[in-house]
Curated annotation (Swiss-Prot):
This is Chaperonin GroEL. It is an enzyme of class 5 (isomerase). It catalyses: ATP + H2O + a folded polypeptide = ADP + phosphate + an unfolded polypeptide. The lineage of its organism: Bacteria, Pseudomonadati, Thermodesulfobacteriota, Desulfuromonadia, Geobacterales. PROSITE patterns: CHAPERONINS_CPN60. InterPro entries: Chaperonin_Cpn60_CS, Cpn60/GroEL, Cpn60/GroEL/TCP-1, GroEL-like_apical_dom_sf, GROEL-like_equatorial_sf, TCP-1-like_intermed_sf. Belongs to the chaperonin (HSP60) family. ATP binds at residues 30-33, 51, 87-91, 415, 478-480, 494. The gene is groEL. Coiled coil: none annotated.
Length: 547
């Protein structure tokens, strides 16, 4: 085991503070509407220019191991806030730095760090309750657009596109962000349930111009195995041909004789049919087939539950108003499933989302949920250059997260005003004298976001803090226009979830750093002297003959 270096007490806390300050000072220049950019060197390609706090934080790695520990702990604050709320990373970093800087001074002066932390925790609890109290629910298109605009660094176009996407696919809908081929940023929406499987043969196409199969009032056969043998499929084909309805077959695969027969019948006009592979793989495929069955009011024809393909009857088939299938995707619009069954399925998927610990599984479950209840919207981000596109795409993703957070928990006045308004709740706290120091730490720290926003805008932070403190309700400083306004009316708002998460995560990590008494790191390996070069380059004499 490698030898370790250990640092204690004040020396350890000073190292943490240096690391915290280095990282926070690089991140906090990006805060607010007049925040500056940070340029990050990349090992290949052009440097990355960003105004996103968490991107800056993730790039920082310090040479000194002990200082690096401090930096990494604050990085954790930014990452955690980004994971929970999708935004507020810079605010969280600024708060963590302010809390730790104040707390470290008190500990150095001989105060008990554990008591300070207790006071800190109680203050945060009271502040979170007060933020929820100040919070106002968000409903209309205009407010959603305002949240998106603020999070996208005052880009109104992005705010409007996000609000439109939310309106079209609903709160549970999936909104994805992709890079566009053109310069414009556009929105595409898909109604109903879409999955990424296209037709198995181009002969199923009904609209040659658009190369898609479109069918109305469709019966849907959902099967979880391969279909290769025609005699298994024949009974259900005869029944649907008699009913005169088009048929969509969704199965693990359709091949050989079965596929050939379907194509021949389609070309002869005997049967309007289309076949696609089932979406997903393994257990996820089974779950998605069940989703389709519930949405369309049909059953999954599976031998596991005692249904055989040859015994399938018309009442086991799903039904939908319209289906379109192109070479890559199948879209089912207006399935005939019972509303109660769909809601039951939605409830079950929501429970699974809450229980899962895997981010990948959660994302896939949310996609399934969206397909059942809302739809899917795709924001295609366009820009003149690749560097600008990457920066813009990151802003759109930030704004999207913030908007979802706002719809979840409501909004509070932005620009750091909500923190100043919540301060009044701390006057009511009755704590022991040592714990009161923890409350004082947080009181000063909550002024830091508005102070930093003002400084980035080239204004004296202390004057702004003083003026806003003396105001009421949503009165605050609009750094973009250098005026004092009603923040809610001016559309300068923050999602409550973002403000709350930033404060909780910052206080949690800063409290842990404050109560740190020892630090342990690996001892750097000493570089030995370089080995001597071997003597003489023997054996090279014979190279004269190469002329």
């Amino acid at each position: 085991m490698a030898a370790k270096i250990i640092k204690f007490d004040q020396e350890a806390r000073n190292c943490i503070l240096k690391g915290v300050n280095t990282l926070a000072d690089a991140v906090k220049v990006t805060l607010g509407p007049k925040g500056r950019n940070v340029v990050i060197e990349k090992s290949y390609g052009a440097p990355l220019i960003t105004k996103d706090g968490v991107t800056v934080a993730k790039e920082i790695e310090l040479e000194d191991k002990f200082e690096n520990m401090g930096a990494q702990l604050v990085k954790e604050v930014a990452s955690k806030t980004s994971d929970v709320a999708g935004d507020g990373t810079t605010t969280a970093t600024v708060l963590a730095q302010a809390i730790y800087r104040q707390g470290a001074k008190l500990v150095a002066a001989g105060h008990n760090p554990m008591e300070i932390k207790r006071g800190l925790d109680q203050a945060v609890e009271a502040l979170v309750a007060e933020l929820k109290n100040i919070s106002k629910p968000i409903k209309d298109h205009k407010e959603i657009a305002q949240v998106g605009t603020i999070s996208a660094n005052n880009d109104k176009t992005i705010g409007d596109i996000i609000a439109e996407a939310m309106e079209k696919v609903g709160k549970e809908g999936v909104i994805t962000v992709e890079e566009a081929k053109a310069m414009e940023t556009t929105l595409e929406t898909v109604e109903g349930m879409q999955f990424d499987r296209g037709y198995l043969s181009p002969y199923f196409v009904t609209d040659p111009e658009r190369m898609e199969a479109a069918m109305d009032n469709v019966a849907i056969l959902i099967h979880d195995k391969k279909i290769a043998n025609m005699k298994d499929l024949l009974p259900v084909l005869e029944q649907t041909a008699k009913s005169g309805r088009p048929l969509l077959i969704i199965a693990e695969d359709i091949e050989g004789e079965a596929l050939a027969t379907l194509v021949v019948n389609k070309l002869r006009g005997v049967l309007n049919v289309c076949a696609v592979k089932a979406p997903g793989f393994g257990d996820r495929r089974k779950a998605m087939l069940e989703d389709i069955a519930i949405l369309t009011g049909g059953k999954v024809i599976s031998e596991e539950v005692g249904f055989k393909l040859e015994n399938t009857t018309l009442d086991m088939l799903g039904q939908a108003k319209k289906i379109t299938v192109d070479k890559d995707n199948t879209t089912i619009i207006d399935g005939y499933g019972a509303e109660a069954d769909i809601q039951g399925r939605v409830k079950m998927i929501r429970a699974q989302i809450d229980e899962t610990s895997s981010d990948y599984d959660r994302e896939k479950l949310q996609e399934r949920l969206a397909k059942l209840v809302g739809g899917v919207a795709v924001i295609k981000v366009g820009a003149a250059t690749e560097i600008e596109m990457k920066e813009k795409k990151a802003r759109v993703e930030d704004a999207l997260h913030a908007t979802r957070a706002a719809v979840d928990e409501g909004i509070v006045p932005g620009g750091g005003v909500a923190y100043l308004r919540a301060l009044k709740v701390l006057e009511k706290l009755q704590l022991a004298p040592e714990q009161q120091f923890g409350v004082n730490v947080i009181k000063r720290a909550l002024e830091e976001p508005i102070r930093q926003i003002s400084q980035n805008a080239g204004v004296d932070g202390s004057i702004v803090v003083d003026k806003v403190k003396n105001g009421k309700d949503a009165f605050g400083y609009n750094a973009a226009d250098d005026v004092y306004v009603d923040m809610i009316e001016a559309g300068i708002i923050d999602p409550t979830k973002v403000s709350r998460s930033a404060l909780q995560n910052a206080a949690s990590v800063a409290g842990l750093m404050m109560t740190t008494e020892a630090m342990i790191a690996d001892k750097p390996k000493e570089e030995g002297a370089m080995p001597a070069m071997p003597g003489g380059m023997g054996g090279m004499g014979g190279m004269g003959g190469m002329m």
